[in-house]
Amino acid sequence: MKKSILIEINEIIEEFSFFDDWADRYQHLIDLGRKLPVIPTEYQKDEYKLTGCQSTVFFVADKTDENMIEFRAQSDAAIVQGLIALILRVYSGRTSNDILNTSPDFLKQIGLDTHLSPTRKNGLGAMTVSYTHLRAHETKR
């Protein structure tokens, strides 16, 4: 059974609190991204590409038979791939209501809001808008 969103968020905050400096936190983020599976080539097309990201990001959402929203995404940039890993860990496999009612504030709590470049912040914002938009319209892609 999947952990609750609150447990996932608290575990992420705790994981990042173990690191004393941002070099170690970035390395952890990169390591998380490396563990993500590659999305199928059928989704590596312009129609699934996020706008607003400097790096290439493909983002897909599917609604399961159990009314859960499954997200898949990948980037060609290591840190962005790590950000994707965090987003998917919290939001993928959740109901629309869970997604809507869960703010991405945990990213601020681990300090990402002050340690990302402006272009990465824009990309993170684009991902946040995308999963919220897809959830709101309950799109099956």
Show which residues each predicted segment covers.
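A glycine-rich, hydrophobic loop/mini-helix early in the fold
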Residues: 58
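Conserved interaction-surface patches within small, structured recognition/assembly domains
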Residues: 62-77, 88-92
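Glycine-rich phosphate/pyrophosphate-binding loops
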Residues: 93-110
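Long, amphipathic alpha-helical surface segments
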Residues: 124-134
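Single conserved hydrophobic/aromatic residue that forms the stacking wall/gate
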Residues: 133-141
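N-terminal intrinsically disordered, cationic/polar leader segments
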Residues: 2-5, 9, 19-27, 31-54, ...
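Primarily the active-site beta-strand->alpha-helix module of PP2C/PPM metal-dependent phosphatases
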Residues: 84
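Solvent-exposed interaction patches of small proteins and small membrane subunits
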Residues: 47-53, 71-75, 97-99
